[in-house]
């Protein structure tokens, strides 16, 4: 830094002389001897001994330009005239430009040797190797002699030099997260570089180590939590633990539809995870009514499975109560509908017979329905008369057949007298006027009424 300050002050002095004196006359540039080579002076510093100024010393410790002895560059005697001062200023400016060029290339080489693009272990090894040997100087013959550099070109050279120094300062400050550590000495000898494969492998290992340490400082765990049950690779970061194994969250998938199951419920079948949809669709029993998978409660009846809301009467759709259900051809019915549809019918009321019944006339009857079909009177003594398939009492039976006595209205079961299209008991076939029996079989008829001969003549003469 002291040399750079000296260069800047000399340049300012030369510029001020040129501005005061005007345009000088042209003169051939003086042949100058090249500046002495720069030597590399390694500096071993310790974090404990370096204080607040240790960082600045460490920044610029690698480039040290020795001051040239006074005998090599003698001081020119002062000129009395303005042309002499101007010529001396141009010579001094040429010398400064040559020194700037040599310094720029040497500083650039030094920076690139210490901070390569990889910024990893390879760069550190090269820096350690550079401590054991001096930097190769660039001969002055390789650089063409500058032809009349102006103040503007010198300023541009200084700008490029300052930019290089700024990059050097930024790169040197980036990895400094703690106290400066002494550089590790590389065991490789000069002239025997390591193979590229080993260098790349070491750089990759160093990069992974730095990445893991950085994640650890940020609170992110980097230790492997086991092998993934799907890809069989180590797990670092988030992990899903299920089925006795660890999984990457993106690898814990449904075996059926391949959707991610992390953070959601799942079912296990034969050691494989399934989402609820795939599990119920593949392995749940089917409802006997809607043929859909049963997910929750289930009713088992008639050799199949049912949703509770679907196990109901197939006729009325009502759920079964405490009275249970009846089965017909594999289908459940409530008691009312089953009896209504399939119970035997009463011949009298055509209703289903639920309890006691009477079997008569090749049919079934409710006890209350087995009565005379004319007067609806129950049969006394359990006896009845049948006419045209209908149960009748005795009176209505004879009435239907015409075997009732026309006088008393009672059935004629024994001897009878048939006259006037009717039947009579023998004792009840009498004259309508005198009421004497007409036993002789001779009588007269008037208005469908029988009369004896004397009464008929007396009345109707």
Curated annotation (Swiss-Prot):
PROSITE patterns: LIM_DOMAIN_1, LIM_DOMAIN_2. A motif (LD motif 4) lies at residues 203-215. A motif (LD motif 2) lies at residues 92-104. Residues 41-52, 135-154 have a biased composition (Polar residues). Residues 83-136 are annotated as: Interaction with PTK2/FAK1. Residues 1-86, 116-154, 171-204 are annotated as: Disordered. The modification Phosphotyrosine is found at residues 38, 60. Residues 121-134 have a biased composition (Basic and acidic residues). Keywords: Acetylation, Activator, Cell junction, Cytoplasm, Cytoskeleton, Differentiation, LIM domain, Metal-binding, Nucleus, Phosphoprotein, Repeat, Wnt signaling pathway, Zinc. Residues 1-240 are annotated as: Interaction with PTK2B/PYK2. The keyword Metal-binding applies. Induction: Up-regulated by retinoic acid. It is found in: Cell junction, Focal adhesion; Nucleus matrix; Cytoplasm, Cytoskeleton. A motif (LD motif 3) lies at residues 157-168. Belongs to the paxillin family. Homooligomer. Interacts with PPARG. Interacts with TRAF4. Interacts with CRIP2. Interacts with HSPB1. Interacts with ILK. Interacts with LIMS1 and LIMS2. Interacts with NCK2. Interacts with NUDT16L1. Interacts with PAK. Interacts with PTPN12. Interacts with TCF3. Interacts with TCF7L2. Interacts with VCL. Interacts (via LD motif 3) with GIT1. Also interacts with GIT2. Forms a complex with ARHGEF7. Interacts with AR/androgen receptor in a ligand-dependent manner. Interacts with CSK. Interacts with PTK2/FAK1 and PTK2B/PYK2. Interacts with SLC6A3 and SLC6A4. Interacts with NR3C1. This is Transforming growth factor beta-1-induced transcript 1 protein. It comes from Rattus norvegicus.
């Amino acid at each position: 830094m002291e040399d750079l300050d000296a260069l800047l002050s000399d340049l300012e002095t030369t510029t001020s002389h040129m501005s005061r004196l005007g345009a000088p006359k042209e003169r051939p540039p003086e042949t100058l001897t090249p500046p002495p080579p720069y030597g590399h002076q390694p500096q071993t510093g310790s974090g404990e001994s370096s204080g607040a100024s240790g960082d600045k010393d460490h920044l610029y410790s690698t480039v040290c330009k020795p001051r040239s002895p006074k005998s090599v560059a003698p001081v020119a005697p002062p000129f009395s005239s303005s042309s002499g001062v101007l010529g001396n200023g141009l010579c001094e400016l040429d010398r400064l430009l040559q020194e700037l060029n040599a310094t720029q290339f040497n500083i650039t080489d030094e920076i690139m040797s210490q901070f390569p693009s990889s910024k990893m272990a390879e760069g550190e090894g090269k820096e350690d190797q550079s401590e054991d040997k001096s930097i190769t100087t660039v001969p002055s013959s390789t650089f063409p002699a500058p032809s009349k550099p102006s103040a503007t070109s010198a300023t541009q050279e200084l700008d490029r030099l300052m930019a290089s120094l700024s990059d050097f300062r930024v790169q040197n400050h980036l990895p400094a997260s703690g106290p400066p550590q002494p550089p590790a000495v590389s065991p490789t000898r000069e002239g025997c570089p390591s193979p590229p494969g080993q260098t790349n492998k070491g750089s990759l290992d160093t990069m992974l180590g730095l990445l893991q340490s950085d994640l650890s400082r940020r609170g992110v765990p980097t230790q492997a939590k086991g092998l993934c049950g799907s890809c069989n690779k180590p797990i670092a970061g988030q992990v899903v633990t299920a089925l006795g194994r660890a999984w990457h969250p993106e690898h814990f998938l449904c075996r059926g539809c391949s959707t991610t199951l992390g953070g959601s419920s799942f079912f296990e079948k034969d050691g494989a995870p399934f989402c609820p949809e795939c599990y119920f669709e593949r392995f749940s029993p089917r409802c006997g009514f809607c043929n859909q998978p049963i997910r929750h409660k289930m009713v088992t009846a008639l050799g199949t499975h049912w949703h509770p809301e679907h196990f109901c009467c197939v006729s009325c759709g009502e759920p079964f109560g405490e009275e249970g259900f009846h089965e017909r051809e594999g289908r459940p019915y409530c008691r009312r509908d089953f009896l209504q549809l399939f119970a035997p019918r009463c011949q009298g009321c055509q209703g289903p017979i639920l309890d006691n019944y009477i079997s008569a006339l090749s049919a079934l009857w409710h006890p209350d329905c087995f009565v005379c079909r004319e007067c609806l009177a129950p049969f006394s003594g359990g006896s009845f008369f049948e006419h045209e398939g209908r149960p009748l009492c005795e009176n209505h039976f004879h009435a239907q057949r015409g075997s009732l006595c026309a006088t008393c209205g009672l059935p004629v079961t024994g001897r009878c007298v048939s006259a006037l299209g009717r039947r009579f008991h023998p004792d009840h076939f009498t004259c309508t006027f005198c009421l004497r029996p007409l036993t002789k079989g001779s009588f007269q008829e008037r208005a469908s009424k029988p009369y004896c001969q004397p009464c008929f003549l007396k009345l109707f003469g």
